[in-house]
Amino acid sequence: MSPQTETKTGVGFKAGVKDYRLTYYTPEYETKETDILAAFRMTPQPGVPPEEAGAAVAAESSTGTWTTVWTDGLTSLDRYKGRCYDIEPVAGEENQYIAYVAHPLDLFEEGSVTNLFTSIVGNVFGFKASRALRLEDLRIPPSYVKTFQGPPHGIQVERDKLNKYGRPLLGCTIKPKLGLSAKNYGRAVYECLRGGLDFTKDDENVNSQPFMRWRDRFLFVAEALFKSQAETGEIKGHYLNATAGTSEEMMKRAACARELGVPIVMHDYLTGGFTANTSLAHHCRDNGLLLHIHRAMHAVIDRQKNHGMHFRVSAKALRLSGGDHIHAGTVVGKLEGERDVTLGFVDLLRDDYIEKDRSRGVYFTQDWVSLPGVLPVASGGIHVWHMPALTEIFGDDSVLQFGGGTLGHPWGNAPGAVANRVASEACVQARNEGRDLAREGNEIIREAAKWSPDLAAACEVWKEIKFEYETMNTL
């Protein structure tokens, strides 16, 4: 006689579906210093109470599933479950709330941004209880921050390596972004650097295409760097994009850059992935390379106000994963960025300790302990007339990157670089003398143009250029 399988109801277990809020909505909970805190902007489906929607987010990003399971009795749910501990309505919005969720630290692998995001945003955004969901901010506790290496070098070490202090660094993305041969590409790099820029940059699209294979580009760019350094007496850099189809190929390209003696490489961290980025950041620290990060694909994730993930979260993740520079919008150029919001995540990139400030979109106080800072890069549709505003907004610890604003100069790349360097130094000097860049900016540029023909020509070309569109990235 064959044995029969008998199903018994265990003590404390009752099969079936129950509301998430019965277990995961805990308004009485007092957060711990070790909790990872998340602020979600959520729009519940009609008929779904906000407490249920918030609890669903907490459950699905921790221990919950759609039905009660008997294996719940084999662990301590009270220790490991996420908790929705507060819900507040969003002012001026109908049926929209900020749900605050606390995640126990033991839910996350040490030093892994990949695991952090897989847990917190990996599954909940398709959940039916919410019509829309956006992760606005994360609080990373110091105990978890200390499990990450972070940026390969950080702001102070970079300045020491470059021997450049007291001003923003200046860069240029080589254009056209695609189609140049390696030799012509290197020529464009040389002209920009000898004109006075600190950096030039591969576009994020440039990897290793038929018109320009990566090794050829690396060799011609290295030649351009060394020649411009010999002529100017300044240390120069070019962001050689090491992003590739496999992590192994990426590391091979970074190793080649190190062998050539160039100071910095680049990675597209969202399309390349956090695991690859963290590996590259470790390699860069071990081998003395700076790491420039491009955020290609970010607007797919963060541009919609009600759904996705705010860039301040991606910026925090990058500081954990590792990068010495990251693109952060301009406020004044062609790419997205409201001033208060942008400065909020710029401070999260650079500063050691940032206080909660909802007026700038900072939902939690963040202590980075000993993690190095990241230089924000302002890039996209900017030119010499923007220099006063950029200097006033971003300050010295930034990279101001002019692509078309250098290469579009009527006299060529080197005069375009001269114009940007003169404009930058004029703004820094005026600021140091106590002048108001926001109010006197145009006058400062005009005064500098009187003794710089290169700047005067640039001012004439771009005097009417504006990008006046309503920003989407608002509080």
Swiss-Prot record:
EC number(s) from the headed UniProt entry: 4.1.1.39
Binding site for substrate: 123, 173, 177, 295, 327, 379
Propiece residues: 1-2
Residues bearing PTM N6,N6,N6-trimethyllysine: 14
Keyword DNA repair: no
Cofactor(s) required, per the database record: Mg(2+)
A Pfam family per the record: RuBisCO_large_N
N6-carboxylysine: residues carrying this PTM: 201
Binding site for Mg(2+): 201, 203-204
Main location: plastid
Catalysis: reaction(s): 2 (2R)-3-phosphoglycerate + 2 H(+) = D-ribulose 1,5-bisphosphate + CO2 + H2O; D-ribulose 1,5-bisphosphate + O2 = 2-phosphoglycolate + (2R)-3-phosphoglycerate + 2 H(+)
Site label Transition state stabilizer, positions: 334
Cellular location(s): Plastid, Chloroplast
Modified residues (N-acetylproline): 3
Active site per UniProt: 175, 294
GO CC terms: chloroplast
Keyword Ion transport annotated: no
Cofactor: binding comment: Binds 1 Mg(2+) ion per subunit.
Any GO molecular function: magnesium ion binding
Keywords attached to this entry: Acetylation, Calvin cycle, Carbon dioxide fixation, Chloroplast, Lyase, Magnesium, Metal-binding, Methylation, Monooxygenase, Oxidoreductase, Photorespiration, Photosynthesis, Plastid
Matching PANTHER family: RIBULOSE BISPHOSPHATE CARBOXYLASE, RIBULOSE BISPHOSPHATE CARBOXYLASE LARGE CHAIN
Function: RuBisCO catalyzes two reactions: the carboxylation of D-ribulose 1,5-bisphosphate, the primary event in carbon dioxide fixation, as well as the oxidative fragmentation of the pentose substrate in the photorespiration process. Both reactions occur simultaneously and in competition at the same active site.
Subunit annotation: Heterohexadecamer of 8 large chains and 8 small chains.
Protein family (similarity comment): Belongs to the RuBisCO large chain family. Type I subfamily.
Misc note: The basic functional RuBisCO is composed of a large chain homodimer in a 'head-to-tail' conformation. In form I RuBisCO this homodimer is arranged in a barrel-like tetramer with the small subunits forming a tetrameric 'cap' on each end of the 'barrel'.
Name of this chain's protein: Ribulose bisphosphate carboxylase large chain
Species annotation: Bazzania trilobata
